[in-house]
Structure formats: structure tokens, C-alpha cells
Regions:
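Flexible, solvent-exposed loop segments that connect beta-strands
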Residues: 54-67, 98-119, 150-170, 205-220
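Gram-negative (and chloroplast) outer-membrane scaffold detector with strong preference
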Residues: 37-41, 49-55, 80-155, 230-234
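Residues that define the transmembrane beta-barrel architecture of outer-membrane proteins
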Residues: 39-41, 69-73, 118-124, 138, ...
Length: 234
């Protein structure tokens, strides 16, 4: 997090490095990278963090499984293709890490009640970027699209299940994503913070061999959902 904050501060340092310059957020700024949005294709990279949760639907009403999530990190690259003046197609493959702990009710033993679910995802989002009219060196935008995750931490091929303390999730999942951000044009590059939600479409849970398993028997579906915050540099 300290490194991410330091990178954010670089933008403002560049903006204020000369006393006689007009800053990005001034009333009448000098227009930076004026022809950038006319580029057909451009690339960048991003750093960020995430908070993954699980949406659990049950077959019958009963005590809910509690999910403790922690803040993970993201890193990846961006390929952007301009389709028209206000519409871009973006591909943002990256590595995402997250960790969750499930607390099951009605277990006397902590060994049975707790299940740790780690995720090391290769994230493949394909997004449409809808940009507004540029105002000075600021250009807000909306994002929407679909994504697929390959979970490198998945143990889907394991023959063991929760009876052997093995909680299993599928390797591939699909999601839809919605969010917004802002392009900030500095003298040498574009800094683009964004926030979006990712919502799982497919069920990720692999059931235990016992259909009446106290860990998976009452679960209709288990889908990931996440808040993703990225700081992109072009």
C-alpha cells in the first residue's frame, strides 16, 4: 500500500514541479498530451488492491456461513483500442491475490468450523470504456464488461474433500464488471484511478462426495464478488 500511495503522489509532484506552470486542477490549465486520445492503440500498466467476498445461496433456511475477507493486491497490464472518440475496448490481464476465511456454524471444533479459501487469480477482463468530454486535463469514464478468472490456488483436482479438511473451488470462473474512473493528464503520462465491482456468474463450489455434507450439502451456489481498485499509468 505504501508503494501505491507513493506512485499516486508522483502525479501531484509532477504537476507542481514548476512554480510558473499551471496545474492539472487549476481553473485554466495548460492542456497536457492534447492528441493522446487520437491514438488508435496504446498500452499501460496498473497496480491496485481488492476485497473479495462470497455470495452464498442456500437450499434451505438456516444459520449463514460467515465470510471474513482481507485486502489483496492486483498488478497487470492494459491494452486499449479506440473504437470511436468516446468508446474504447480494453483488455486488462493481471495477477490478483486474495484470501478469505469461512466460519461454519454448529461445529464444536475449530478445525471443522473454519475453512481458509485462498485465491491467486490470473484475471482476464474485456471491458468497454465510455469516456465523457474532456475538460482541461480531466476526463471521467464508465467501465463495463465481462471477465474470466483462472484460480492458480484451486485444488479442484483433489480427491479429498472437507472430511479431510480440503475445501475445493473450481479453477475457472466467469464474472461481469461495472465501474468508473477518471483520466488525469499530466505532462508526460496519464494517471487513471478506477474502482469497479466484479460479480460472479458461475457457481465456484465443488461439492463433497457426501450429498449431506455439513460443509457443502445445503449450499445452492457460491459465487465471488469483489471491489477492485486500480491505479493505471499510460
Amino acid at each position: 500500500m505504501k508503494k501505491i500511495i507513493a506512485l499516486v503522489l508522483i502525479v501531484f509532484a509532477l504537476n507542481g514541479n514548476a512554480q510558473n506552470s499551471k496545474g492539472i486542477f487549476s481553473k485554466d490549465p495548460i492542456i497536457n498530451l492534447e492528441t493522446w486520445q487520437k491514438h488508435r492503440i496504446y498500452f499501460g500498466f496498473y497496480l491496485g488492491f481488492n476485497s473479495y467476498d462470497l455470495k452464498i445461496d442456500y437450499k434451505t433456511v438456516g444459520p449463514d456461513i460467515q465470510v471474513d475477507n482481507s485486502t489483496g493486491f492486483n498488478v497487470g497490464i492494459v491494452a486499449d483500442v479506440r473504437l470511436q472518440e468516446y468508446l474504447n475496448l480494453r483488455f486488462e490481464p493481471g495477477l490478483y491475490y486474495s484470501s478469505k476465511i469461512l466460519h461454519y456454524p454448529n461445529f464444536a471444533s475449530e478445525k471443522d468450523a473454519l475453512r481458509e479459501v485462498n485465491g491467486t487469480y490470473i484475471h482476464f477482463p474485456l471491458l468497454l470504456k465510455f469516456s465523457s468530454l474532456r475538460t482541461g486535463n480531466i476526463r471521467p469514464y464508465l467501465l463495463g464488461g465481462v471477465s474470466a478468472n483462472l484460480n492458480l490456488s484451486s485444488n479442484s483436482k483433489s480427491l479429498e474433500d472437507n472430511l479431510e479438511n480440503r475445501f475445493r473451488m473450481k479453477s475457472w470462473t466467469t464474472n461481469y464488471e461495472l465501474g468508473f474512473g477518471i483520466d488525469i493528464f499530466s505532462e508526460y503520462f496519464i494517471f487513471s484511478p478506477s474502482i469497479r465491482g466484479s460479480f460472479g456468474i458461475s457457481d465456484e463450489l465443488i461439492r463433497d462426495k457426501d450429498p449431506n455434507s455439513p460443509w457443502t450439502g445445503n449450499i445452492e451456489s457460491m459465487k465471488s464478488r469483489a471491489v477492485l481498485i486500480n491505479f493505471t499509468f499510460h
